[in-house]
Amino acid sequence: MTDSKSLNVLFLCTHNSARSILAEATLNHISKGKFKAYSAGSSPRENQTPNPMALQVLEKAGIAIDGLSSKSWDIFALPDAPHMDLVITVCDNAAGEVCPFWPGQPATAHWGYADPSEVAGTDAVKLEAFMQTLIQIKRRLDLFTSLPLASLSKMALENSARELAMK
């Protein structure tokens, strides 16, 4: 973590339709080039379209949604995939699954969030659940992006990312 290049961060959840999409878009929005965020899932949505409510709250927050899609985490284990510096699971199911081998053995962390797509109720209630998840993710990412990443070793990056799970 000692050069000036941006760090690649991969966010994982089961379907890559809500939480990991929110995290990818938010980190790319707030990082000012310090990070390049990606997202994927173990069982992505077949139509490759993120949850419409996830896209709606991102747009409402002024975060770009261009290029967001649900995709398999397998594409990030391929030899020509971007090298990841950090892989973060954002749902408990993905955290418990056997992940692919990530080239370069990136640092890992788990930041669990409740699945907003499982909230029952009116569209307004569901949309509020997505907004609250976005707020939680952004709060943690604001702390993450303020870390002195250039001076962190891989182990220190991993420890710092894991400590943020408690925030």
Task: Describe each PLM feature range.
Residues L86:
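Short, Asp-centered acidic motifs that coordinate Mg2+ and/or phosphate
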Residues T89-V90, H110:
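Redox-cofactor binding/interface segments in oxidoreductases and associated redox assembly factors
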Residues S17, D92-A95:
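Short glycine-rich anion-binding loops that position phosphate/pyrophosphate groups of nucleotides
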Residues P82-H83:
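Alpha-helix C-terminal capping/helix-to-coil transition sites in glycosyltransferase folds
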Residues V98-K167:
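Phosphate-binding/catalytic loops
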Residues T2-L78:
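Conserved active-site segments centered on acidic
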Residues N47-Q48, A95-E97:
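Short, charged/polar "capping" segments at the starts of alpha-helices
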